[in-house]
């Protein structure tokens, strides 16, 4: 049996930052009474430091906070966080502490019967030859122990060692502050392979100033110190010479001769302070070596001096030191066992070359806890089996949108009662009923109850608008609760989740029902959809229930959820409640029943002044899971529900009267389920509403059950803070208690001053309501949450603190960067989150590792947009978040992930190496390697661990193959555990064994059996000729021919790797012969044998027997085997020998995968293999779209490679977890309460009553018009053979329209300038004119512009523009607005556009004459006239104030000179005026300033009276000769005026470019009418109220209705028009921006679900007046095919209309055209018929708009059924038709396809029988009438 006593004790160098688990273990050991002296020495370090600073004040520059934290950590249970800067003042003494604790723990473990003295003495005896050795800081520990005979000596020497370590660490930190402030020194290990490597390394180092060798570690390793800025270049230079550089986490200069002065300072301090010198003894008791020379220390007189030199100034020759030590061990008498070295410390420093060659064993005492840190401490309370853990929570209450804000509100005793938010409820006399007493509408209202992120939940704006805000808020708060539970972390999401939501009423139903029904009205207001929507969004399959028990609804929901989890109905559940007030009815009803406070004050639970409750709004949810499952899943547990109960009051009194005995029974039942006594409950969250009847009853119940002889029980109610949230009140109380448990505090009770007189004193029964914040001092915190419903239901929930898990073990991941993944559904949400996270970082002291872990695990990887980055430090992270431009650049749509294929390479050499940091850094990887190691040991084979980290060649084939497989398996299994969604695995040669194992064909144990057994057969039964393998670049046929080209030798093709990449195999001689004769490029492979050839035949029979001994299963993950002709259909024992014997058809396998799956994400399983290179080779040039990932876990920074690879896969949309953020690593992190998802919200709110109709229209218009241009095409009503007539919409909410309208105020109101009518018409003409009439470089000509009615601010009106084509690029136009029952024409005219041709614009002949007559000389004449009047800018606009006031940014007139009836002005626009979001055609702001010159001239006339003003009523012609786009001037304007009667002036204005003196604009015949200011005031007021009375239809000759209904054939322009209209319809219904909609967009991707499809079908039929609906779910439409379907129906309808028109013409009844037939109508009758038809249709359309609440235009071809006509609506509509037209009709008895036009024809036909409006000839022929009305009415 091997000895457990060491031959040598080695103390390692300065520690790297220990894991929290390690620190926790050391901390626990320091509490051992046996180590109290060591703990005391640590405790005294801060005091020693103070003394040291007094002696050497320069040390005051060093931050001593870490030293104080070290003391606190050693004394109590605080966590020791290692600062990012890795201060040596902390790490140096911590290194000594770790060494000593490890040593003493090891000594204690030797023999429990030995005394402490005996244990140390036995070790001194066993180390008499090897002694105690230490490197750098470890020398202090070694010296302390080597010079100690007794336990007392150890304590004395330990104190010296700790203090010296502190001194050295402090001086190294001081050196950093002084010399390394900007570029710190860091340490690194350099390793090389060959014997001449050191010379090359030394040569490289000479090229780097200041770099020095600090330690000779091994025969091929050294430690070097260099500045951080030098590391990158140094690594590259060393790599070029075959050397590897690995950084170690030590900052500062040790072993540097530059510290000579520091050494003298320290020696001086030591000479004056005995506590810094080791006690004088003749020599160390056991051998102790100078680690500078390796020689033995023979005198201990100045041991402190030697120690300081070894650490500070002298380089360490550790290799020589340990060589001498090992040599001394080898000189011992021959023993039957290998020497044991006890290695202490967190860093191993044993030279591997020495221990391997001398067969020395090494042992390191554990630095981690032996018990699982996630094992609950249940010593004080035995949680019942049915206990339910709360693993996530979220809330939204008044004044608190997060859990932290909720806690801050509660602990501050805040109250959130206030007035009803503006715009929430339509408080008009019709909608607000008068209760017995007028009650104020006050409460605890959410400020943004109508805001909702519809995009996140895939809902359209239209659907969101009709959704009860309770549904919307519940969705968002539920999302936060789910997010906080880390449900979104990578991996398969558990869908067996229940949803239980408490909801009282649905106030919003009243609002929705005041509007016309839509497809979304029912689903938006039915309460069942509150829970249903949540379950549907997350795809949950568990029960989904909406529960209403009045005020106890949410508590009942929680109670039911707990029951269902216990019964196995679901594994997890979301439970809570919501309450939103959107209608006054419930408020008035509650007030009438005297529930509410008549004063509108806050809730005052149990207070003497309580007079009723105050309503509140809010929502809260908790995520629930069985406690045992939560512990197993390593969930963060916020609290535990150990019992809940529900009952109902008896029926002896009124239903709303609470019953004390029912409540008492309830508490006792809940306590019984919790297995608790009343005294175990130390807080009660009471229902406590502040009602005079309910509070005393509840207090009596609490007293009866929980009062008496016991510690004080506190109780209170959260309703004082946020009001009575009714259906959400139970969850509010539970969340408050959970926050109390987390913070271990009892908050003050708000609004409590004096106990209700109906409640007896509390103190006798040890009850208390506190008004101060208290510490919750209970040894075990448990509370009872009460929740009662007005209908009699009572519920109580017992909730207690979670199991006290041991503190997190901390992490030892020293990463160069921590990866972050942040996702959002929209770019705005993503940016909002980054801002919130950045702000949160300013107020947290959490380490970067914990933040990265918490943020990344909460992200929902299914969202559309994401950013990824790696942060090196908190400062780096803040910079990344703060760089908004970089975020814009990095934020990108989450790509659709490609299929993932795991690739396993074959053997390519005899070296298998894994960097130790990868093994130690990832418990996920380590667990799988350890599993393989365990299985191999159980098989009697050598373990893996000792060989993994060695880069030496491995001759043992069994070990080689087992190592190779194990690393491949461990990497692949780690990826699978991290959630990598693998869709195919493929293995090359030996890699196929890994593929079989990962796919599930064989178990791990069986696979290792095959791998090891096969390797043993190779080792034992392979013939003497091993063979060799040759890679060759040639095509397949060439490879086969080469294999046959060596006579007398058999050469085979072993691997078909690519189109021109093959591997040949044969004997050594055969391959040599081939190499000599071929001209192809070849390369020998470093394989151990010639596989896949006849050389394997010797052992195939034995291999077959081995293959038959294992079990084969059907693969879980599809596997592509490298076989010819196709993948294996099944796996049998016969396949394995075939696999070893036959060639590897890797190229074929990759080609099959590529063909089947398309572009893939290829991930290599394994370390140092060439799988990805092989895949690229096989794909050849066909790599487009593929991505490739290979971990470099054999590099010097393996975890950095893991970080980079993970981020790359995140960027490709792959849902995979970073290995170090996996659940297995959770014990090494502390969870942080990072910001929750930031919603990208839009406000949606339907008001009820008439007020709602106006606000509805405006808000809907704003939302609908968000993406619309200023002028946009609505429809094209051109007919075949007739002029085109087009309808355009004018977007009043466009920013440009707002600028045009609000740039000036006319008598305090806004009024549209004449120039804006020109711009609107020009934009419309440019849209329909195509390239011929583009907006760039155009000539605009306007003729006969007439202003019929001014246009002001009309929020409820729809402004439109109509065009009729009357020539090439020439259009008649009219600007019209519609509001209520009025249709108003504002302006008409004719406009034409011409484009520049050859750089010139076409100018009519009259303008050529005008330019000659009106030259620049006229301007100069006016300016030179001494009698002329000159006005400056200020005076000019002062004159204009009589009519209008202009904003400074819109003022262009700088000066003006007036001479008689002529004027000259100089103009220049301010630069700020150029803020147009669209390209303008005529620039209305500039054009308005030009027109002002004539107006000012008129106002300056001698005959202009004080009350006179002039308004422009039109103009004859306007022509532009040069585009004004982007022009600011300067311009010169000449105006000439001519009186035309006593009240009218005609003005001609000419605009010249001041620089070129060229005429650029002419305005002829501008008419100015003289009116009084009071008249203008009336006009302006009416314009802004839209109250003018005008005819229902105002049309000029320019835009008359077409004279025929013949339609033009469809063309591409029609299709594009359909696409444009359809895009806007889709945007309105789904919320998808039109810019993201193209013809190829599938409707499913545009979020068109069944409800949206119904709405879209209706809207399509309305907009395109189709005769039959299009069923969107019968075919899989995309937008393009839908456009084609619409066009097809339109073509069919147009063809029918054309045939009808032809037939009508044949009977001489053509509308608008005279015939010779005697049956034709006379001119006046025909005109009256047309006018009457238009009037009836207009009035009918407005009536239908009101009946069906439709804001869009209703076309004649629209079927009434598509508008939503049902039997109830029909009754109302029939009444309206009778009132308006005298028409009595049963609408439901008519054809279901009745259209609006058809109904208008019925009205006309009915009126024709009783009026004389239509000619008698027409009355005699009903068919003719119907024909004409059909043509006009569609």
From Swiss-Prot:
Coiled coil: none annotated. It is an enzyme of class 2 (transferase). Gene3D superfamilies: 3.30.70.3290, 3.40.47.10, ACP-like (1.10.1200.10), Malonyl-Coenzyme A Acyl Carrier Protein, domain 2 (3.40.366.10), Polyketide synthase dehydratase (3.10.129.110). Keywords: Multifunctional enzyme, Phosphopantetheine, Phosphoprotein, Transferase. Residues 1616-1690, 1731-1807 form the Carrier domain. Its cofactor is pantetheine 4'-phosphate. InterPro entries: Ac_transferase_dom_sf, ACP-like_sf, Acyl_transferase_dom, Acyl_Trfase/lysoPLipase, Ketoacyl_synth_AS, Ketoacyl_synth_C, Ketoacyl_synth_N, PKS_Beta-ketoAc_synthase_dom. The keyword Phosphoprotein applies. Residues 1269-1398 are annotated as: N-terminal hotdog fold. Its EC number is 2.3.1.-. GO terms for molecular function: 3-oxoacyl-[acyl-carrier-protein] synthase activity; fatty acid synthase activity; phosphopantetheine binding. Residues 91-255 form the Starter acyltransferase (SAT) domain. Residues 1269-1577 form the PKS/mFAS DH domain. CDD domains: PKS (cd00833). Residues 1697-1710 have a biased composition (Low complexity). Residues 385-801 form the Ketosynthase family 3 (KS3) domain. Non-reducing polyketide synthase; part of the gene cluster that mediates the biosynthesis of meroterpenoids called sartorypyrones. The biosynthesis of sartorypyrones begins with the production of triacetic acid lactone (TAL) by the NR-PKS spyA using one molecule of acetyl-CoA and two molecules of malonyl-CoA. As spyA lacks a thioesterase (TE) domain, TAL is likely generated through self-release from spyA by spontaneous lactonization. This is Non-reducing polyketide synthase spyA.
């Amino acid at each position: 049996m091997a000895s457990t006593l060491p031959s040598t004790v080695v103390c390692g160098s300065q520690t790297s930052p220990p894991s929290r688990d390690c620190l926790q273990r050391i901390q626990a050991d320091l509490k051992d009474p046996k180590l109290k002296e060591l703990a005391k020495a640590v405790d005294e370090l801060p005091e020693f430091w103070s003394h040291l600073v007094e002696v050497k004040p320069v040390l005051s520059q060093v931050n001593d906070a870490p030293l104080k934290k070290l003391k606190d950590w050693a004394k109590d249970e605080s966590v020791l966080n290692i600062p990012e800067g890795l201060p040596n003042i902390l790490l140096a003494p911590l290194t000594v502490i770790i060494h000593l604790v490890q040593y003493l723990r090891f000594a204690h473990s030797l023999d429990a019967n030995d005394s402490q003295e005996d244990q140390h003495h036995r070790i001194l005896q066993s180390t008499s030859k090897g002694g105690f050795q230490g490197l750098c800081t470890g020398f202090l520990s070694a010296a302390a122990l080597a010079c100690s005979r007794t336990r007392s000596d150890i304590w004395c020497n330990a104190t010296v060692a700790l203090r010296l370590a502190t001194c050295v660490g402090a001086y190294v930190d001081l050196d950093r502050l002084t010399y390394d402030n900007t570029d710190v020194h860091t340490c690194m290990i350099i390793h090389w392979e060959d014997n001449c490597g050191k010379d090359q390394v030394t040569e490289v180092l000479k090229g780097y100033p200041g770099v020095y060798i600090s330690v000779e570690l091994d025969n091929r390793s050294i430690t070097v110190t260099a500045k951080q800025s030098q590391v990158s270049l140094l690594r590259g230079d060393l790599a070029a010479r075959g050397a590897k550089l690995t950084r170690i986490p030590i900052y500062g200069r040790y072993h540097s001769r530059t510290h000579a002065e520091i050494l003298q300072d320290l020696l001086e301090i030591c000479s004056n302070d005995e506590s810094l010198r080791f006690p004088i003894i003749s020599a160390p008791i056991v051998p102790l070596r100078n680690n500078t020379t390796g020689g033995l220390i023979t005198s201990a007189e100045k041991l402190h001096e030697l120690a300081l030199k070894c650490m500070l100034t002298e380089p360490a020759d550790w290799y020589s030191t340990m060589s001498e030590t090992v040599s001394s061990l080898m000189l011992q008498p021959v023993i039957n066992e290998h020497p044991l070295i006890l290695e202490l410390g967190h860093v191993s420093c044993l030279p591997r070359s020495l221990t391997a060659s001398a067969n020395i064993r090494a042992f390191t005492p554990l630095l981690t806890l032996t018990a699982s840190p996630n094992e609950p401490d249940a010593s004080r309370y035995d949680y019942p089996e049915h206990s339910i853990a709360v693993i996530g929570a979220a809330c939204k209450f008044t004044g608190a949108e997060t859990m932290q804000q909720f806690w801050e509100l509660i602990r501050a005793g805040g109250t959130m009662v206030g007035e009803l938010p503006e715009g929430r409820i339509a408080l008009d006399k019709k909608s607000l009923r008068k209760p017995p007493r007028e009650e104020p509408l006050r409460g605890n209202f959410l400020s943004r109850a109508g805001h909702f992120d519809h995009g996140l939940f895939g809902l359209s704006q239209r659907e969101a608008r009709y959704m009860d805000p309770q549904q919307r808020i519940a969705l968002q708060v539920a999302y936060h609760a789910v997010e906080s539970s880390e449900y979104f972390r990578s991996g398969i999401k558990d869908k067996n989740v229940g949803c239980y939501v408490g909801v009282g009423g649905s106030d919003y139903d009243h609002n929705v029902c005041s509007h016309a029904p839509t497809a979304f009205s029912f689903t938006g207001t039915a309460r069942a959809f509150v829970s249903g929507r949540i379950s549907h969004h997350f795809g949950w399959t568990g029960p989904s229930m909406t529960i209403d028990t009045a005020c106890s609804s949410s508590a009942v929901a929680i109670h039911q959820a707990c029951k269902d989890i216990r019964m196995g109905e679901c594994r997890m559940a979301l439970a809570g409640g919501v309450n939103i007030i959107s209608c006054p009815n419930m408020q008035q009803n509650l007030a009438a029943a005297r529930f509410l406070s008549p004063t509108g004050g806050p809730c005052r639970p149990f207070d003497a002044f309580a007079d009723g409750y105050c309503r509140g709004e809010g929502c809260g949810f908790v995520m629930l899971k069985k406690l045992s499952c939560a512990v197993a899943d390593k969930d963060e547990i916020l609290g535990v529900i150990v019992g809940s109960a529900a009952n109902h009051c008896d029926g002896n009194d009124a239903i709303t009267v609470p019953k004390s005995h029912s409540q008492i029974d309830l508490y006792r039942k809940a306590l019984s389920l919790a297995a608790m006594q009343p005294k175990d409950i130390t807080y009660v969250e009471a229902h406590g509403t502040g009602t005079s009847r309910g509070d005393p009853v509840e207090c009596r119940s609490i007293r009866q059950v929980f009062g008496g002889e016991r510690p004080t029980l506190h109780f209170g109610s959260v309703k004082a803070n946020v009001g009575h949230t009714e259906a959400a009140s139970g969850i509010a109380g539970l969340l408050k208690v959970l926050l109390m448990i987390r913070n271990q505090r009892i908050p003050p009770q708000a609004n409590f001053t004096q106990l209700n007189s109906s409640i007896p004193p509390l103190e006798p029964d040890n009850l208390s309501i506190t008004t101060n914040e208290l510490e919750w001092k209970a040894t075990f915190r448990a509370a009872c949450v009460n929740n009662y419903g007005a209908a009699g239901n009572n519920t109580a929930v017992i909730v207690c603190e979670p199991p006290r898990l041991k503190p997190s073990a901390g992490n030892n991941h020293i990463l160069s960067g921590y990866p972050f993944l942040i996702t959002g559904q929209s770019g705005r949400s993503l940016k909002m989150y980054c801002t919130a996270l950045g702000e949160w970082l300013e107020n947290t002291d959490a380490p970067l590792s914990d933040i990265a872990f918490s943020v990344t695990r909460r992200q929902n990887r299914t969202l559309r947009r994401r950013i990824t980055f790696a942060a090196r430090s908190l400062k780096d992270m803040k910079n990344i978040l703060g760089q908004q431009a970089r975020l814009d650049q990095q934020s990108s749509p989450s790509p659709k992930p490609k299929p993932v294929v795991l690739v396993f390479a074959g053997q390519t050499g005899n070296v298998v190496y894994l960097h130790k940091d990868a093994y130690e850094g990832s418990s996920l990887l380590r667990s799988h390697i350890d599993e393989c190691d365990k299985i191999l040991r159980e098989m009697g084979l050598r373990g893996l661990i000792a060989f993994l980290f060695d880069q030496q060649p491995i001759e043992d084939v069994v070990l080689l193959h087992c190592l190779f497989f194990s690393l491949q398996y461990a990497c692949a299994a780690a990826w699978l555990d991290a959630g990598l969604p693998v869709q195919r695995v493929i293995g090359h040669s030996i890699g196929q064994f890994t593929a079989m194992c990962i796919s599930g064909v064989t178990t791990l144990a069986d696979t290792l059996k095959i791998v090891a057994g096969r390797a043993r057969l190779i080792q034992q039964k392979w013939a003497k000729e091993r063979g060799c393998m040759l890679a060759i670049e040639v095509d397949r046929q060439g490879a086969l021919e080469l294999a046959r080209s060596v006579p007398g030798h058999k050469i085979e093709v072993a691997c078909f790797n690519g189109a021109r990449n093959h591997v040949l195999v044969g004997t050594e001689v055969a391959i040599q012969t081939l190499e000599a004769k071929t001209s192809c490029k070849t390369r020998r492979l470093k394989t151990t044998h010639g596989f896949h050839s006849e050389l394997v035949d010797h052992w195939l029979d034995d291999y077959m027997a081995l293959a038959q001994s294992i079990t084969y299963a059907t693969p879980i993950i599809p596997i592509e085997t490298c076989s010819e002709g196709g993948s294996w259909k099944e796996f049998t024992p016969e396949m394995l020998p075939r696999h070893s014997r036959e060639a590897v058809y890797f190229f074929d396998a990759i080609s099959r995968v590529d063909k089947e799956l398309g572009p893939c994400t290829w991930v290599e399983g394994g370390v140092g293999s060439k799988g990805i290179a092989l895949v690229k080779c096989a794909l050849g040039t066909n790599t487009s779209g593929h991505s490739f990932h290979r971990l470099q876990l054999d590099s010097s920074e393996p975890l950095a490679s893991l970080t980079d690879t993970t981020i790359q896969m995140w960027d490709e949309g792959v849902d995979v977890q970073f290995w170090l953020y996996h659940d297995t690593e959770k014990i090494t992190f502390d969870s942080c309460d990072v910001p929750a998802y930031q919603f990208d919200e839009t406000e949606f709110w339907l008001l009820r009553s008439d007020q709602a109709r106006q606000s509805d229209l405006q808000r809907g218009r704003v939302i609908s018009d968000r993406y619309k241009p200023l002028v946009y095409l609505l429809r094209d009503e051109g007919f075949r053979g007739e002029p085109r007539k087009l309808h355009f919409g004018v977007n009043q909410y466009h920013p440009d329209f707002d600028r045009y309208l609000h740039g000036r105020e006319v008598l305090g109101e806004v009024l549209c300038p004449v120039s804006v009518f020109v711009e609107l018409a020009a934009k419309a003409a440019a849209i329909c004119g195509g390239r011929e009439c583009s907006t760039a470089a155009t000539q605009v000509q306007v003729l006969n512009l007439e202003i019929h009615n001014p246009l002001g601010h009309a929020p409820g009106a729809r402004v439109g523009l109509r065009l009729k084509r009357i020539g090439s690029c020439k259009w008649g136009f009219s600007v019209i607005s519609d509001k209520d029952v009025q249709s108003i024409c504002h302006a008409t005219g004719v406009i034409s556009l011409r484009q520049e041709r050859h750089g010139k614009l076409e100018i009519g002949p009259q303008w050529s004459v005008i330019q000659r007559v009106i030259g620049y000389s006229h301007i100069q004449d006016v300016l030179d006239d001494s009698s002329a009047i000159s006005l400056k800018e200020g005076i000019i606009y002062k004159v204009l104030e009589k009519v209008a006031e202009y904003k400074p940014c819109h003022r262009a007139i700088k000066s003006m000179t007036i001479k008689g009836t002529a004027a000259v002005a100089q103009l220049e626009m301010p630069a700020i005026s150029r803020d147009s979001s669209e390209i303008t055609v005529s620039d209305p702001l500039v054009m308005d300033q030009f027109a002002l010159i004539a107006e000012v001239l008129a106002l300056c006339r001698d005959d202009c009276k004080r009350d006179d003003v002039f308004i422009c009523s039109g103009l004859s012609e306007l022509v532009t000769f040069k585009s004004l786009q982007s022009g600011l001037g300067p311009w010169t304007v000449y105006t000439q005026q001519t009186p035309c009667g006593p009240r009218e002036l005609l003005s001609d204005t000419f605009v010249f470019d001041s620089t070129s003196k060229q005429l650029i604009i002419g305005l002829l015949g501008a008419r100015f009418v003289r009116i009084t200011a009071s008249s203008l005031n009336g006009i302006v007021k009416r314009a802004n109220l839209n109250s003018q009375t005008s005819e229902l239809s105002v049309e000029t000759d320019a835009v008359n209705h077409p004279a025929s209904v013949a339609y033009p054939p469809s063309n591409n322009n029609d299709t594009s028009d359909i696409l444009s209209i359809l895009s806007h319809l889709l945007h309105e219904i789904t919320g998808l921006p039109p810019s993201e909609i193209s013809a190829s967009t599938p409707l499913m991707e545009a979020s068109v679900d069944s409800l949206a499809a119904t709405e879209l079908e209706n809207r399509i039929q309305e907009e395109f007046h189709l005769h039959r609906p299009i069923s969107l779910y019968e075919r899989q439409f995309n937008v393009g095919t839908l456009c084609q379907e619409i066009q097809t129906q339109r073509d069919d309808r147009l063809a029918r209309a054309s045939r009808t028109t032809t037939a009508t013409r044949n009977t001489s009844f053509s509308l608008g055209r005279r015939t010779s037939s005697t049956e034709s109508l006379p001119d006046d009758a025909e005109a009256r018929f047309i006018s009457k038809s238009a009037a009836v249709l207009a009035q009918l359309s407005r009536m239908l708009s009101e009946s069906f609440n439709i804001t869009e235009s209703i076309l004649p071809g629209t079927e009434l059924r598509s508008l939503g006509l049902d039997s109830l609506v029909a009754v109302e509509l029939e009444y309206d038709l009778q009132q308006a037209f005298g028409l009595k009709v049963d609408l439901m008895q008519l054809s279901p396809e009745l259209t609006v036009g058809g109904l208008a024809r019925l009205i006309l036909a009915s009126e024709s029988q009783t009026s004389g409006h239509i000619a008698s000839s027409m009355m005699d022929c009903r068919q003719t009438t119907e024909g004409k009305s059909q043509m006009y009415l569609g």
